[in-house]
């Protein structure tokens, strides 16, 4: 174990005690409040004389499987690019998502499906919980390698609550449409993580600079995450949209947007790369921006051409962000964004929200016909004009940025509590701080980790 005996003793107790407390408290709350909904409960379902073929499970579960794979495989492997942080990237993704999906079931349940004193859960609850876990993992990407697992669990504890409140305000109070989460998931998760990273700024992080890069095999493993995310992203955006034409259209728009963002990424990467060569960081990340940018508008009548245009724009903007804006973010704004979530989720998320404003403002009864009610119910009912819906969409973006910024600031203050274990500057981005790494003898391979230097900690 790297570090002093007192640090090792604290690490031995801190994570187990926190995991036991959080799981125990969650289990008690589940026992008191959580019940099956009428589509899951044996007695209620059969009492209603429905055919099993009508159960929502058969319509939603295939999408849930894809979303689940994205959260646990896609996000986990996308972050293994760091040469000595693969165990932590995949392992802490596993830990955070497993806790976040339980906690978000409770938080979202109290806000969305609390009836008769109970939270009623089904397959839609599982999808919503995974969406929330995705936002937490986006924030994790901004502080990857600089925080301990106990800090990350506390981050998730706070972020899930704020995610649920922000989502409730946007979807239920403002009537915002955001099927694929450009605002509620990507923008919120990115800027929560970026503000958190700013509060946890480490001026002496250069001591771990030699571990911040990738090696050939770590980039190859990260591409596994990229491919999983790329393939399943149409399901992610379409998972909770209206069955039928709405879900079909959402998947189609996402499909074309991802394809265009990939070509845009390859084009810009070669254009701005050294000697015209491609940068694997760009390909791993910016190629996915097409899925983010149509998150809000994918269920709308965006048109295939609109999806291609939005995807290409997102891929180019994301690539330029990785090449030029990411260094400025650290040097000028003191935001140490490990995974570049600002370029993959932040900027494309904001662009996606603005695209939603535009497409909502163009909505007409002629274009949507009877389908207007499933996409823009308030417009269909005459309670709101298309212009008013567009303004509500824009206001939803500002609300999301406010919740994310305030939440990230509060989270940073929470994670800076002195008793929380975090790696010193000289030991960041290193698996051996928290993991037993097979095939390596610490005394020989990681002797520098035993040196306690005077430096900052998160």
UniProtKB/Swiss-Prot annotation:
Residue intervals on the Extracellular side: 35-61, 108-124, 171-178, 241-251, 304, 368-393
Show where the record puts the motif Basolateral sorting signal.
429-432
Q: Where in the cell is it found?
A: Cell membrane; Basolateral cell membrane
Q: Which residues cross the membrane?
A: 14-34, 62-82, 87-107, 125-145, 150-170, 179-201, 220-240, 252-272, 283-303, 305-325, 347-367, 394-414
Q: Which residues lie on this side of the membrane: Cytoplasmic?
A: 1-13, 83-86, 146-149, 202-219, 273-282, 326-346, 415-458
What residues are glycosylation sites in this protein? 49
Q: Name one GO cellular component term.
A: spectrin-associated cytoskeleton
One annotated GO biological process: transepithelial ammonium transport
User: Which key words are in the record?
Assistant: Ammonia transport, Cell membrane, Glycoprotein, Membrane, Transmembrane, Transmembrane helix, Transport
Q: Which cysteines are joined by disulfide bonds?
A: none
Pfam families to which the protein is assigned, alphabetical: Ammonium_transp
Catalyzed reaction equations: NH4(+)(in) = NH4(+)(out); methylamine(out) = methylamine(in); CO2(out) = CO2(in)
What segment(s) does the record annotate as region Interaction with ANK3? 416-424
Q: How is it modified after translation?
A: N-glycosylated.
Protein role: Ammonium transporter involved in the maintenance of acid-base homeostasis. Transports ammonium and its related derivative methylammonium across the basolateral plasma membrane of epithelial cells likely contributing to renal transepithelial ammonia transport and ammonia metabolism. May transport either NH4(+) or NH3 ammonia species predominantly mediating an electrogenic NH4(+) transport. May act as a CO2 channel providing for renal acid secretion.
Report the sequence similarity comment from the record.
Belongs to the ammonium transporter (TC 2.A.49) family. Rh subfamily.
Q: What is this protein called?
A: Ammonium transporter Rh type B
- Gene name of this polypeptide: RHBG
């Amino acid at each position: 174990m790297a570090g002093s005996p007192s640090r090792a003793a604290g690490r031995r107790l801190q994570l187990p005690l926190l995991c036991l407390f959080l799981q125990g408290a969650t289990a008690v709350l589940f026992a008191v409040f959580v019940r099956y909904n009428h589509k899951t409960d044996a007695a209620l379902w059969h009492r209603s004389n429905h055919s099993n073929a009508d159960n929502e499970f058969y319509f939603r579960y295939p999408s849930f499987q894809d979303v689940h794979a994205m959260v646990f495989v896609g996000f986990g492997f996308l972050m293994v690019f760091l040469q000595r942080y693969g165990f932590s990237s995949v392992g802490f993704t596993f830990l955070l998502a497993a806790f976040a999906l339980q906690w978000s079931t409770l938080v979202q349940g109290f806000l969305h499906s609390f009836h008769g004193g109970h939270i009623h859960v089904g397959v839609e609850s599982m999808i919503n919980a995974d969406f929330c876990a995705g936002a937490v993992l986006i924030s994790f990407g901004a502080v990857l390698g600089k925080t301990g697992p106990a800090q990350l669990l506390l981050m998730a504890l706070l972020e899930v609550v704020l995610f649920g409140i922000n989502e409730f305000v946007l979807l239920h109070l403002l009537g915002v449409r955001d099927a694929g989460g450009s605002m509620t998931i990507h923008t919120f998760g990115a800027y929560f993580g970026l503000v958190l990273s700013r509060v946890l700024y480490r001026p002496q992080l250069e001591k771990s600079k030699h571990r911040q890069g990738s090696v050939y095999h770590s980039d190859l493993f990260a591409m596994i995450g990229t491919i999983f995310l790329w393939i399943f992203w149409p399901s992610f955006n379409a998972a909770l949209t209206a069955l039928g034409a709405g879900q079909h259209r959402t998947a189609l728009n996402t499909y074309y947007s991802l394809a265009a963002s990939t070509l845009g990424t390859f084009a810009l990467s070669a254009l701005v790369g050294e000697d015209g060569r491609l940068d694997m960081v760009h390909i791993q990340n910016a190629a996915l921006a097409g899925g983010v940018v149509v998150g809000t508008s994918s269920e709308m009548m965006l048109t295939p051409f609109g999806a291609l245009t939005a995807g290409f724009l997102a891929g180019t903007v994301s690539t330029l962000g990785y090449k030029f804006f990411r260094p400025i973010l650290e040097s000028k704004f003191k935001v140490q964004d490990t995974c570049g979530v600002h370029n993959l989720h932040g900027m494309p998320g904001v662009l996606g929200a603005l695209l939603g404003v535009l497409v909502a403002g163009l909505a007409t009864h002629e274009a949507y016909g009877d389908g207007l009610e499933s996409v823009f119910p308030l417009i269909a009912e005459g309670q709101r004009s298309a212009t008013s819906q567009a303004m509500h969409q824009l206001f939803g973006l500002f609300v999301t940025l406010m919740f994310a910024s305030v939440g990230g600031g509060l989270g940073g203050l929470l994670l800076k509590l002195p008793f929380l274990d975090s790696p010193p500057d000289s030991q960041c981005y290193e698996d051996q701080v928290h993991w037993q790494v097979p095939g390596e003898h610490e005394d020989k391979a990681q002797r520098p980790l035993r040196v306690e230097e005077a430096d900052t900690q998160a």
